[in-house]
UniProtKB/Swiss-Prot annotation:
This protein's name: Capsular polysaccharide biosynthesis protein CapA
Transmembrane segments: 20-40, 171-191
Gene, per the UniProt record: capA
One of the GO BP terms on file: polysaccharide transport
Pathway(s) served: Capsule biogenesis; capsule polysaccharide biosynthesis
Role description: Required for the biosynthesis of type 1 capsular polysaccharide.
């Protein structure tokens, strides 16, 4: 006969393993804290924006150029990451960072149907992230007229005072560690209860054998 576990019995088994439910989540919390504060590199991100916009007075011409500029944004996002731009950025930063290093720090994004390019730079220093982002925007806006034969780029906003820590995120990591510890504890309890076939109580004897218990023998040391 298959035995069923009611809610009170389930809660009883959980209470029986309360030490495990406390120790493993706390252990996960401790491990996450150690990793977050001592092993993960701190990263700061700074952002600047580039506007792709041809100056003009005729409204009809401007409307056409807006669509043209939007189509060019994807091309410009690739130009920002090109060796021509990044090599010059590296040179103007006194070769403190190589082209590949700058490329690994750089992320270029834009919203759909937008003329704005977002340039994000991540490094181990907020001030360095700001400096590199500003230099990329400056070099790009200077080089585009020569590359594309059109002067339709301007710096919309600089990266000054935008540097902020983006990694690690200790609170998120601590919560994740706590949850992982709790899940592991519950899995251990579940596996232990499923594979432990021993009969431990009078109720389990009655449920398993469907006969009344006449008496019990106490354990002697």
């Amino acid at each position: 006969m298959e035995s069923t576990i009611d809610l009170s019995e389930l809660l009883g088994r959980v209470r029986k393993n309360m030490k495990l439910l406390i120790i493993l989540p706390l252990l996960g919390l401790l491990i996450s804290a150690i990793i977050s504060f001592f092993f993960l590199d701190v990263k700061y991100q700074a952002s600047t924006q580039i506007l792709v916009n041809q100056k003009g007075n005729d409204s009809q011409i401007m409307a056409q150029e807006v669509q043209s500029n939007i189509q060019l944004v994807n091309t410009y996002s690739e130009i920002v990451k090109s060796p021509r731009i990044l090599d010059k950025v590296s040179k103007e930063l006194d070769d403190k960072y190589s082209r590949s290093e700058i490329s690994s720090m750089l992320t270029v994004t834009n919203q759909a149907e937008s003329q704005v390019l977002n340039i994000d730079v991540e490094s181990k220093s907020g001030s360095n992230s700001e400096k590199i982002a500003n230099k990329i925007a400056e070099v790009f806006s200077d080089e585009v007229p020569d590359i594309m034969n059109v002067d339709n780029v301007s710096v919309l906003s600089t990266a000054d005072n935008t540097g902020k820590q983006v990694a690690p995120k200790p609170m998120v990591n601590l919560v994740v560690g706590l949850v992982i510890g709790l899940v592991i504890a519950l899995l251990i309890i579940f596996i232990k209860e499923v594979f432990d076939k021993r009969i431990k109580t009078e109720e389990e004897v009655e449920n398993e054998l469907v006969i009344p218990v006449l008496g019990s023998i106490q354990k002697f040391d």
